[in-house]
Amino acid sequence: LYNVLKITSLEELREAAETGRLREIPRMGEKAERNILDGIAKSLARRGIPIVRAMALTESLAGQLGRQNGVRRALMAGDCRRYREMCDGISVVLVSDKPARALAQAASSFSNADVLEASDSLLRVRSEFGEISVWAEEPGHAGSALARATGSARHTAALERIAREKKLSFVETRLLDESGAPVAAPDEQSFYGLLGLPYIAPEIREGQGEIEAALAGRLPELITIEDIAGDLHMHTVASDGVGTAA
């Protein structure tokens, strides 16, 4: 690409594919152009932090914050816990008897970051790695906090709706009863149970029908590493191959 067309950027590659200039290169035809344009479109649509990088950053941050005085546990949450291929940011939940103090200590770790939001239960900053959310709650509400920090916006909105149907409120990191008193949910199993739901695995908390499936007793069984017997890789006419799978 560089030797023939002097292409040095993604934008130049897209322009060459759109104008037909790629065909100046041997064995580059219409099919190759289409595949390149499709690949560029997918790449641009998946901006964010790759899951491998996000996982490493989250584990490092959780390890650092988990060593703070008064922090019992530091748990992975957000896109990373849902194993999104590309993560919008990283999230950690701190379990502490004094959550506000835990967040104040965490804030000192981000002295060079822009603070986007700060409350007694959430610290959200923009750093060189992207957006970072640090939640904090008491042990008795760790389950509701982790559920809040893990699910997608659509999933948590559905949980809020179901809570209202149960005469409860799901506000920030806690469940509240009709009087406004907090309802304990020390783990996610108890949190979902209070809403009349079975435990929903983080990987499917996307607001794409998992709530309805849970209510109907039709949650899918997730594939685990023990289920994988091998890896099959092939190129067919569906991509850049010349034969079919048959």
Model region roles, listed by residue range:
Residues 1-90, 94-123, 127-130, 143-144, ...:
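Accessory alpha-helical DNA-binding modules that contact the DNA backbone or grooves
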Residues 52, 150, 239-242:
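Residue-level marker of alpha-helix boundaries and capping positions
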Residues 56, 154, 243:
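Conserved active-site and cofactor/substrate-binding residues in soluble primary-metabolism enzymes
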Residues 131-138:
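A short acidic-to-branched-hydrophobic micro-motif
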Residues 144-150:
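Short, solvent-exposed helix-loop connector elements
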Residues 186-220:
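Histidine-rich, glycine-flanked metal-binding segment
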Residues 213-246:
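An N-terminally biased module of ancient metal coordination in phosphate/nucleic-acid-related enzymes
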